[in-house]
From Swiss-Prot:
Cofactor binding note from Swiss-Prot or TrEMBL: Binds 1 Ca(2+) ion per monomer.
Function: Hydrolyzes cytidine or uridine to ribose and cytosine or uracil, respectively. Has a clear preference for cytidine over uridine. Strictly specific for ribonucleosides.
Coiled coil segments of this chain: none
Oligomer and partners: Homotetramer.
Annotated residues for binding of Ca(2+): 11, 16, 124, 240
Enzyme Commission no: 3.2.2.8
Organism encoding this protein: Escherichia coli (strain 55989 / EAEC)
PANTHER family attached to this UniProt entry: INOSINE-URIDINE PREFERRING NUCLEOSIDE HYDROLASE, URIDINE NUCLEOSIDASE
Name recorded for this polypeptide: Pyrimidine-specific ribonucleoside hydrolase RihB
Assigned keywords, A-Z: Calcium, Glycosidase, Hydrolase, Metal-binding
Swiss-Prot/TrEMBL GO biological process terms: purine nucleoside catabolic process; pyrimidine nucleobase metabolic process; pyrimidine ribonucleoside catabolic process
């Protein structure tokens, strides 16, 4: 089995933590580094959350702090979903794990420039780090094997009627990424909302046990509450984890190639990913857009990763 080399760029975040857990443990993934961006909460909080998850699960991968602000727009956070810390719910031990001193954008550029073009970027938060890296060093573009991102929607948004949170948090950065010419795979809300984590799924992961089962339960019981209160959903979708699922086995997710453009004009559609599903614009497709996911396969994959953290000695 080929191991996919990835850099996970995230804003932890409840579903980010699940993506981290999967990426660090599955044998099909070679997690080179974790870069942190502001998004679900401010950078100081998302960084602490990422380090806490790494410490709890003994994920021995370097963590780098990145962009504290969007490129242009005023900063927003998703405290209605992720709480005051950005990862409300779990209680962690005192933090001793530290981030690297190198800035995340520099790490991304240096790692890609030294590579053979075999590294996939997996941004599951706002695209600020990725866009700034592209603008600072355009020579990285042909070095990126693929970008598999969580963001956008071809239907309804979740932060505005038009826009999904990750894209709305930094639409100008998203515009840079979607016009970069790099192969893109987009896991938008239309797909990720199919991964609603019900009480039955939480109980299943609790039964699987170990530190990851405990963390999964604490994380998803919190989002069960906030997702129902905000959106009436029967549980919290694990949006970001779908990107890791796709990288492990793309056959579990049906995609459709489309031309996707990010609306950066002020107004009700600011931050919308305009997906030309019918091809009416006649422009060449630039993105594989996730349509449906085999949820039985997906939750089996999550459980496999949860069980991977159980110590046998």
């Amino acid at each position: 089995m080929e191991k996919r080399k990835i850099i996970l760029d995230c804003d932890p975040g409840h579903d980010d933590a699940i993506a981290m857990m999967m990426a660090a443990k599955h044998p099909a993934i070679d997690l080179l580094g974790i870069t942190i961006v502001a998004g679900n909460q401010t950078l100081d909080k998302t960084l602490i959350n990422g380090l806490n998850v790494c410490q709890k699960l003994e994920i021995n991968v370097p963590v780098y702090a990145g962009m504290p602000q969007p490129i242009m727009r005023q900063q927003i956070v998703a405290d209605n979903i992720h709480g005051e810390t950005g990862l409300d719910g779990p209680v962690f031990e005192p933090l001793t794990r530290q981030a690297e001193s190198t800035h995340a954008v520099k790490y991304i550029i240096d790692t890609l420039m030294a590579s053979d073009g075999d590294i996939t970027l997996v941004p599951v938060g706002p695209l600020s780090n990725i866009a700034v890296a592209m603008r600072m060093q355009p020579a990285i573009l042909p070095k990126i094997r693929e970008i598999v991102l969580m963001g956008g929607a071809y239907g309804t948004g979740n932060f505005t009627p038009s826009a999904e949170f990750n894209i709305f948090a930094d639409p100008e950065a998203a515009r840079v990424v979607f016009t970069s010419g790099v192969p893109l795979v987009m896991m938008g809300l239309d797909l990720t909302n199919q991964t609603v984590c019900t009480p039955d799924v939480i109980a299943r992961m609790e039964r699987a046990g170990g530190p990851a089962g405990e963390l999964f339960s604490d994380i998803m019981n919190f989002t069960l509450k906030t997702q129902f209160e905000n959106y009436g959903l029967a549980g919290g979708p694990v949006h970001d984890a779908t990107c890791i699922g796709y990288l492990i086995n793309p056959d579990g997710i049906k995609t459709q190639e489309m031309y996707v453009e990010v609306d950066v004009n002020s107004g009700p559609c600011y931050g919308r990913t305009v997906c030309d599903e019918l091809g009416v614009l006649g422009k060449p497709a630039n993105t594989k857009v996730g349509i449906t996911i085999d949820t039985d396969w997906f939750w089996g994959l999550v459980e496999e990763c949860v069980r991977g953290y159980i110590k046998t000695h």
